[in-house]
Amino acid sequence: MKIKEAALGTVSRILRFAGILLVIYISMVFYLALTERRNAFPRAITHNEARAAITGKAKSINCTLDDGTKLEGFVVGNENNDVLLYYPDADEDAAQFLAELDSLPGYAAATFNYRGSGENKGTPSQETFESDAQMIYECASQINGNAPKVVAGRGTGAILAIKQEKKDNVLILIDPVLSIADAISDKYRLLYPKFLVRADVKISKEDISNASNITILSDRARFCDRSHTVENALGNVKLTKRSTEPLSEVILNVTKRK
């Protein structure tokens, strides 16, 4: 009898503990669901070190959206050269790319922060994400009157880059993700499974008219598997890996192989 009572007591404690864990898990999932927009469309914090690094060689530019919101941007290089437009990752200050790039001979490298990021006002959302990216492309086209020759994007920015594909431009997808849902589920794993993510911004094959123009650049080792996943999903795109070379050298090599 005592053994039976002890066993029942143990089972009861285990079930009670499991119940507590389940309540905690459900609470965390519920919290992530409530705050999904902040994870899907985060605001990039101003990166002071990167901005200090590009002081004196980057020119400030801006892009006015349809609703009057002004986006800050930067351009490095001779503005009469072909333009490389860069879409930063969701939580990346655009200045960080230019600080790492330093310079790109033969190109004017331009990039803008999204609404709500850096010094920009506004609230990022799914409703404005892609339309803002199109306006950014148009603003970059005004730098010298010609559409960007090269369009690059990192992480979720790669989704925006591929949606600007044109017949003659070169696309460089740096450590890309297939969708915002993938990015969130990769970050939180079992805490917030992909099927729960409501944000619906993704790369699809319908976005691609000429896969030969697209190169996936596997830049950071921790995102290597992710880059291969995108490569397999898109098919017939080129993949290149960066090891110790400067970022500018790798990008120039990609543009020369076009």
Where do the PLM segments sit?
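An N-terminal hydrophobic leader/cap segment in hydrolases
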Residues: 13-62
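Alpha/beta-hydrolase fold nucleophile elbow
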Residues: 144-155
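Hydrolase active-site cap/lid region
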Residues: 158-210
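Alpha/beta-hydrolase-fold catalytic nucleophile elbow
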Residues: 113, 152, 172-175
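The feature captures the conserved acid-bearing segment of alpha/beta-hydrolase catalytic domains
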Residues: 181, 192-241
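N-terminal Lys/Arg-rich, disordered targeting/topogenic segments
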Residues: 1-11
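Membrane-embedded segments
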Residues: 67-139
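Catalytic active-site module of serine/aspartate enzymes centered on a nucleophile-bearing elbow/loop
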Residues: 240-258
